[in-house]
Amino acid sequence: QAGPLLRRLAAEFCDSPLAARCTVALEIAPDADKAILDADAALLARAVENLLHNAACHNPGPVQVQLSAVRTGKTLRITIADDGAGYPPAVLHALQTGEAGENTPHILGLHVVEQIIRAHGGTAAFARNAPRGAKAVLVLPVTEDPAAR
C-alpha cells in the first residue's frame, strides 16, 4: 500500500540529519492511502528518497518540502515539491531532451528516479514549482486489490 510506504519514508527522512535543513509536510488523500502498487518497495523508496535528499541538499537555507499522493482512476500521483531554488534550466533541458551539455549540473539521481518509475510502468516529470522551487511528479499504475473483488 502506498500510504504506509510514504509515511515510513517521510518519518525516516525526518529522523535523518538532513531534516535539520527542511520541513516536510505529508499529505496523502484517503483514496491514495490504500492504493496498491505493483512495485518493488525498495526501488520506489529509493526514488522518493533521492528526491527528498535533493530538496534538502541542493537548496540554501531552510526549505519546505511537500510530499503528497493522490489517486486518479487507475494511477497514483506522488508529488515532491519544495520552495527552494528550483531546478536550473540546464537540468530541465537535459531531462526533457536527453541532451546534457558540458555546463549541465550533475543529474544522475534524477535519472535514477526516472528509470525506477519507468521500470514500474509509470512516468516521472520534473518542473519548476510555482511560485518557486522544484517539483517532481511520479505517476504509477495502481493494481486492483484482489480482496476488493
Regions inferred by a protein language model and the residue ranges of each:
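Short helix-loop "hinge" at the ATP-lid/N-box region of the Bergerat-fold HATPase_c
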Residues: 54-56
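Short beta-strand/loop element within the Bergerat-fold HATPase_c
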Residues: 64-74
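Conserved micro-motifs of the catalytic ATP-binding
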Residues: 36-39
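Acidic ATP/Mg2+-coordinating residue in the GHKL
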Residues: 82
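Short helix N-cap motif at coil->helix boundaries in the Bergerat
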Residues: 86-93
